[in-house]
């Protein structure tokens, strides 16, 4: 069973799809931790409603590398095998990406790098 760490900054719609897949047996995984850099993000409430462990890590007034160090500690402390970035609105450090190389997937609603920063229908309309 894959032990997931989910990182998101927005509503967590994809988190709900993952939870549903785990619950119906189509995904052989468990969510060990949900991390957000946005304390107002609904993904944290969604995690709480589904009785999943969650953690807010502020990205204010710290370097990208320090944020990555803090996130890595939380992920490792929670036994994470694989990270899913779903609606995660922060660029991660090179060090973080290298440390989690081959263990991280970014679910992005846009075609990168041309439409970076786009979300939802706005980005789909731009692409079309």
Where are these regions (language model features)?
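One-carbon transfer enzymes
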Residues: 1-128
